[in-house]
Curated annotation (Swiss-Prot):
Its main location: cytoplasm. One of its GO terms (biological process) is rescue of stalled ribosome. Its EC number is 3.1.1.29. The record marks N9 as: Discriminates between blocked and unblocked aminoacyl-tRNA. InterPro entries: Pept_tRNA_hydro (IPR001328), Pept_tRNA_hydro_CS (IPR018171), Pept_tRNA_hydro_sf (IPR036416). GO terms for cellular component: cytoplasm. The gene is pth. Belongs to the PTH family. Hydrolyzes ribosome-free peptidyl-tRNAs (with 1 or more amino acids incorporated), which drop off the ribosome during protein synthesis, or as a result of ribosome stalling. Catalyzes the release of premature peptidyl moieties from peptidyl-tRNA molecules trapped in stalled 50S ribosomal subunits, and thus maintains levels of free tRNAs and 50S ribosomes. It comes from Aliarcobacter butzleri (strain RM4018) (Arcobacter butzleri). It is an enzyme of class 3 (hydrolase). This is Peptidyl-tRNA hydrolase. The active site is at H19 (proton acceptor).
Amino acid sequence: MYLIVGLGNIGEKYQYTRHNVGFLVIDEMAKNLQTSNVNNSNFQSTLLKSGYNLFAKPTTYMNNSGVAVHSIKEYYKIDLENIIVIHDDLDLPFGTVKFKIGGGHGGHNGLKSLDSHIGKDYIRVRIGIGKPQNKDDVANFVLSDFSKEELNKLEDIIKHTINAIEALKTADIDEVKSKFTLK
């Protein structure tokens, strides 16, 4: 079983923000699959199931994502190598998609929470959102909406990311890196 987690913040006002790119990928994946809702308030997530895949959007807000993912991981006894986390990355230019296992949180509070609750060795799908011109403006930047131009490009980036996630279930991460990394 795979647990595919999109990081983001709940609420309509955050729907198309840079910080919610993980949620956007999960939403698009769910559109193309037959899914059923898993109702369990202990999971603190919107959780969908399709075959041997679980798709989670933690409802704890970004900074406590690890609490939600930990409860799902423990309940379903999912190994870390079968957890795929999709998140925004300030250190990558907009539209870049990269993959890795483990590593630091790079100041990302969602990853920081995950690392402290489940460990670090899960699969990370990093989607570049670019950086603000002023370093002091990071919080406002990640919580701002994508521009129209970015949203137009994002559709293809999300489709590409979904194909990569499907490949991650059957291929070695190095194969996925060489085939699906977008720069």
